[in-house]
């Protein structure tokens, strides 16, 4: 698997998302299914997992099941060379309107994350939500404290807007590369080409100005929902086609507002690339983000181990392959 060298870290070019792992239970068939996916990713050379302290709390055990699942797998397989990104400070499922973006919540989540993962130090720890009423300097200060304690390698943000990221970077100053690992917001080819988009539930997109800023400042972006939940492949199942005028014909069952002229163009290109390469349109849309001329590692989740091979094949494509050079990627 291709790797990305960024700020002294060698990271797999495709990050495996684990949000649903363990949510159906931490034993028996659900655990075996998760282990099979993790094993396949590792055997392919994958060394980068994304999780969060909140992942699984909506599941059958109402606990941080994803972190616990990963911890069980790491221990069972004796694996010590996996880079883990986890997250803290998400609101609780039963208290949606109560912010947990504060020092005490961060430290409590960190203690539980380390215990569940079985790690003395979590390589990358992100704040999962923002509270714009909080001074960004307060947030940065307790994140720096966690790094200085040795309990995390570096911190970053998830679901933060440009002004907040910029203020944090300015506040860190010359220490930025030591402390700040990157940003994880929603970003996908389909979303990028959808025009105005306001994600639900306090999530934030990678806007074009934010992407430009991260490129200028060499900030790593770890996009979640990087394949838009398979939006382009879902169009096929919905029977959507392209008319003589180059526009969509039919309706999408998921995110119909994304049916823009630009996404119709993307749909045509992806269909052609799929026929030429055999890669799914979903995998190709992840490769689109990975091909950006800035540090971007898409986070993808799979329900079956064999799906990982499709992503790996798509990631090997170069800009000049199969017409990708004619695709205006940037």
Locations of the language-model features?
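N-terminal binding-site loop/beta-alpha segment at the start of enzyme catalytic domains
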Residues: 1-82, 148
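Short, well-ordered coil/turn segments that N-cap beta-strands
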Residues: 9-14, 45-47, 78-82, 119-123, ...
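Conserved beta-strand positions
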Residues: 16-18, 51, 86, 124-127, ...
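Active-site mouth loops of central-metabolism enzymes
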Residues: 20-32, 92-104, 128, 133-134
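A short acidic, helix-capping loop that chelates divalent metal ions and anchors anionic groups
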Residues: 22-25, 55-58, 91-97, 191-196
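Short, acidic/polar
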Residues: 28-41, 100-117, 165-170
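Active-site groove signature of glycoside hydrolases
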Residues: 114-135
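Beta/alpha (TIM)-barrel catalytic core signal, keyed to glycine-rich beta->alpha loops juxtaposed to Asp/Glu
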Residues: 130, 134-330
